[in-house]
Amino acid sequence: CSYGFMDDTVKAGEKYPNKLFMHCSGYKQSANVGTYFADLYQMYYLNGLMAGALTKSNRIGYVGAFPTPEVVRHIDAYALGVMATNPKAKVEVRWIYSWFDPQKAKEAAEALVAAGVDCLAFTEDTQSVVQVAEEHTAAGKQIYSFSHYSAMQKYGENSCVSGQLVDWGVMYVKIFEDIKAGKWTNADMWWLSGDKAAVLGGEFGVPINPKFVDALKTKVVLTADL
């Protein structure tokens, strides 16, 4: 279940107390309702490093679904990455107030490009932002993009630099193993890159689109954290 089903999942747990429920991305637990999520801030930071290195306009765009802790965390990590490679760049956010609305996502991305942005990232569940970047790139204006959750590089072969991917299977196997072993708890489960659930790339097995590797290699980063 995703964020919008959080309260209903808790209600289902109350209705069926002898069943176990797991809610993805929420924060409410009960005796038989647990939560889990792939925490992608590490990947967003790495994406931000790339965006800061590639931008020519020093204006970075972000399309956000809702200002929830999850999305704000993504934006903060992305902005910190941008700052590390390009302190002059600014991150501009457009909210669409929807998890899935291809048209709103497209309009927000187009508005950011019209405002001078040349890098786009997002937290919403469509490929619209990547497609907008690809369309502008095909028309002669290079716009860089970063996919979100799913493998979206196929929608932006000439614009999608990298992204964040989730291997949900790793989490599900662990959850069912804990249930089978009688070790399940309702504690919040966070999965990072070290857990192999949060993965860097616009498609699995390709951390960085090969078309942008040479350009990224020209950027030298000298910061304390790197």
Predicted regions and their residues:
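A residue-level marker of the well-folded mature domains of exported/periplasmic proteins
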Residues: 1-226
